[in-house]
Amino acid sequence: KKNMTVVVDKNKIITIETGFSKAGNADRVIDLKTKTVMPGWIDMHVHLEFETSPKRQIEGFTYNPADYAYQSVQFSEVTLLAGFTTVRDLAGSGVNISLRNAINKGWIKGPRVYTAGKAISTTGGHIDPTNGYRKDLMGDPGPLDGVANGADECRQAVRQRYKDGSDLIKITATG
């Protein structure tokens, strides 16, 4: 529709009125007469800590958690500016929980984030951090790393995600 007024209070649409409403002295007016206004998009599967690139595998050896945290700030703002106002972040190093908290506190710009924190997988599953590495480089990942085998370890991993502040649980049962 054309010639409409959208009234927003504290980042929430309060009403949409026909015609151009007169603004009060304390109101901020953003003239969008030549623009199309639409609701924000929702992306149901993102990873705000990284992006797909040929360097992704080596970054696992050269980046520390702070590198992922700083990078995720940039990716969050880019995501918001692309029109996504809500995302479901389905696994990362755990930095994504702090990222969500920083956005919620207004410290950084980004979309509303619902995050799984770290995902959970079986040994050899999609999230097993030792996949593709020589045996002497593998280590022995467990529930804290996202690798859980059997009911007890799965319960432990889920409880840890809850304790860490995850909004949801992501389980990758296969490779």
What does each of the following model-derived ranges do?
Residues 23, 104-109:
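Short, structurally constrained coil/turn elements
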Residues 6, 11, 34, 42-45, ...:
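Divalent metal-coordination and catalytic microenvironments
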Residues 107-175:
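Metal-coordinating catalytic core of metallo-dependent amide/deamination hydrolases
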Residues 35-105, 123-127:
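Metal-associated gating/positioning segment near the N- to mid-region
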Residues 1-2, 69, 148:
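Short, solvent-exposed loop/helix junctions and linker helices
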Residues 17-18, 29, 73-77, 100-101, ...:
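A generic local structural motif
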Residues 17, 32, 82, 90-91, ...:
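Active-site-proximal beta-strand/loop segments in catalytic clefts of secreted hydrolases
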Residues 1-38:
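Histidine-rich, glycine-flanked metal-binding segment
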